[in-house]
From Swiss-Prot:
Substrates-to-products reaction catalysed: a 1,2-diacyl-sn-glycero-3-phosphocholine + H2O = a 1-acyl-sn-glycero-3-phosphocholine + a fatty acid + H(+)
GO biological process: lipid catabolic process
One cellular component term from this protein's GO annotations in UniProt: extracellular region
Function: Snake venom phospholipase A2 (PLA2) that induces a conspicuous local myotoxic effect and moderate footpad edema. In vitro, it shows anticoagulant effects and is not cytotoxic on myoblast but is able to lyse myotubes. PLA2 catalyzes the calcium-dependent hydrolysis of the 2-acyl groups in 3-sn-phosphoglycerides.
Protein name from the UniProt record: Phospholipase A2 crotoxin basic chain
Amino acid sequence: SLVQFEKMIKEVAGKNGVPWY
């Protein structure tokens, strides 16, 4: 789903130190 996709992006971005909000 779109929610899971956004959550995945935020988790990956968080590991890279990039804020996705």
